Amino acid sequence: MFKEVADIKTADMIDLPVPQAHYHNVAVKPSEMQKEMVASLAERAEKVRGGNVDSSVDNMLKITNDGRKLALDQRMLNDMLPDFEDSKINACVDNIYRIWEETADKKSAQLVFCDLSTPKNDGSFSVYNDIRKKLIERGIPESEVEFIHEADTDIKKKE
């Protein structure tokens, strides 16, 4: 039904020039707390597999989701935990800042995507807020660190 009303064009159909992507992976080691929490996830999974817990209380989807959050930052599961110096977020901030410094004369823009977390104003931990705070503390002007979530009109989104 969707195809009846949609005009779909794929990249190969319109031959758009696309820049060559340069991928790189940054590996970070987990904190001791993360290692302990991974062991706890394994224990939870064993209980679920063994049928020892009601699926409304815990299930593999919840465990997997908690594992994804934990892999990003331990504070995603418990915002009372410390900010681990060698976390993925801190590695990301280091990289963003390095690129910002290297391209400051060109006023280049960077886009950063995070599929976990959203900006929050309720005092709880947010990956977005943490990254913004750290970039501003390093000297990037606050006006240069924006979230798509803050663009509440089509005009703002185009800017």
Name each region found by the language model.
Residues 81-93, 123-128:
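Phosphate/oxyanion-binding active-site loops and adjacent basic polyanion-contact surfaces
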Residues 141-159:
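Conserved helicase ATPase core of P-loop NTP-dependent helicases/translocases
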Residues 116-147:
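Conserved helicase motor "Helicase C" RecA-like lobe of SF1/SF2 P-loop NTPases
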